[in-house]
Amino acid sequence: METKEKNTATPYDLDGKPPLKLAIPLGLQHVLAMFVGNLTPLLIITGVCGIESGSELQVALLQNAMLIAGIVTLIQIYTIGPVGGKLPIVMGTSSGFIGVCRSVAVTMGSGVAGYGAILAASFIGGLFETVLGGFLKPLRKFFPAVVTGTVVLSIGLSLISVGIGSFGGGSTAPDYGSLENLFVGTVVLVVIIALKHGTKGFTSFSSILLGIIVGYVLVTVMAMVLPTTFTYVDETGATIEATKSWVINWSKVADASWFAIPKIMPVKWVFDAKAIVPICIMFVVTAVETVGDISGITEGGLGREATDKELSGGVMCDGRGSSLAAVFGVLPNTSFSQNVGLVAMNKVVNRYSIGIGGIFLIACGLFPKLAALISIMPQSVLGGAAVMMFSSIVISGIQLITKWPLSPRNVTIVSVALGVGYGLGSNSAVLAQLPESINLIFGGSGIVPAALFAIILNIILPKDEKTEVEMAEEILAEKKKMESK
């Protein structure tokens, strides 16, 4: 009888096993929603660290990123001891770390050693977040929606400039900002918007992936009809001939093997306090973000608040997963807000269905040709998708902030935290006279100061006379009163 109940479960049941004909497409739907976002941070940071596009190392890292996302997703869904929230949450490489990782890479010399420092710091930071997750219950009161929303919003704002940089072909490319790069990025962005809002079902929730495929086709056709090289004068006055940044090198896909066992420790770790301190602070920030995502899943998909056990297990999974990711040369893992939004939209909360998506990600991590195909993506194609992805993070933050009425207290928290955070992120030169350690922590992306100010202001500002719930109830009552008239 129990088996029958499990087999007749629906996608809207948290537990049980729906028929595979339903579970497989629903699981793949979640993979498609996060596939590009899972690999984008790695493409950006490896570029900053001077790891060649399409190189054997970058392909191995992308391969591992897919593998780790699948493994950590399964841990989050089914748990190992206290680790995991036992909720339908998809895990993947965190975009929130892009800013601080870029700062660390530049400080360490923008080479492979910089990437090694990021990995060592991520391993330690993951252990730190795991411990933080174990003590989350007494700390939960410090992370209301106004704080988590401000953090998510600051992450989105800090990433938009990164997306625009890729949109133009990559800020280090000799042909950065060329009409061809801007044309490619614009086409990809327009296709994504058209598919997302002009279609339904598969094409709508896969709009980013399909937009990138269109970008690949577009640059391939452009390479057939337009010149693929150009000349420019470098800083020394020499005339250089170079390949345009939007041209794809298909030979790297042809050279990649069909199957390979993922490599452990593909990059040598470098332990340096200049990397460890800011990245550990960023793990506090991402813990706040994960609390918001878990709350979004339970409230949007299950119609209830998250329990302390779910929040604690979810944050601990973030930490353990990030430490595991570092062992495989991958950037920190966290819950994916895109998938939280998908669950809230379609109410599909079945863990078995989403677990199938995790298994698919693990399978993808075993095929280097797929990783090679992604590694040769032109920056302008990536930028067209990144602008959309990073902007959606901004909207997620706004939705969290406006979850309850914006009281004067909450307005102060949001405005001061964003003002200081975004201001320092966009004009870090104001900290030039301070010690390097302060610059590295607070001048990288603005996320850390925004998070710290939001948390501190939430603690020290007098509480509102009316609670958020009471204010919301008053507004609902007023609306009903107006409707009755």
Describe these PLM feature segments.
Residues 61, 82-97, 141-150, 204-210, ...:
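Short, non-helical or kinked segments that cap or interrupt transmembrane helices
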Residues 28-35, 123, 147, 178-182, ...:
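Hydrophobic alpha-helical transmembrane segments of multi-pass membrane proteins
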Residues 1-88, 96-108:
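N-terminal signal-anchor module of multipass membrane proteins
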Residues 20, 46-86, 277-351, 476:
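Membrane-embedded helical hairpins/re-entrant loop segments and their flanking transmembrane helices
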Residues 1-25, 228-264, 299, 304, ...:
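Intrinsically disordered, low-complexity non-transmembrane regions of multi-pass membrane transporters
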